[in-house]
Amino acid sequence: MSFLKIKDLSVDYQMRKETVYAAKNVNIEVNKGEILGLVGESGSGKSTVGNAIINLIDEPGKVSSGSVLLGDLNIHEDPKNIVKYRGKKVGLIFQDPQTSLNPILTIGEQLIETIQTHLELTKEEAKERSINLLNEVGIKDASSRFDNYPHQFSGGMRQRVVISLALC
């Protein structure tokens, strides 16, 4: 059985004079432990598919057909509880980490918030886990960088922070 199965996923954007078909009949299967990368030209629908997987399509867009199955569970049928799956079971890393990070929160605050959303840990336990994750992705001297803001990291280091968020 697939860990993540996307079946005939289509995403449309209803514009003023036309419908834009951003993704049409996408089918993907990912087994447990596998990592999937979507590669393509600008505007080919990579981010749209990623956002559809975790139910983050903004108006005027909508998932017009298909399903996203996490095991046997269709995550689009349970939109109020999507946060249980987003980040805990499925993590996405987009090319530009700047858009994924909140510029007014420190890296540490963002990691703690994400960890505490998914795990019942105290703030201190979440901080310890955060520092371990930052070390794991190659952020040198993670404990001293914990209170830095995203703009204080290079692009590559911001990418590593986003990876640590996905690993939470």
Predicted regions located by residue number:
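ABC transporter nucleotide-binding domains
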Residues: 1-168
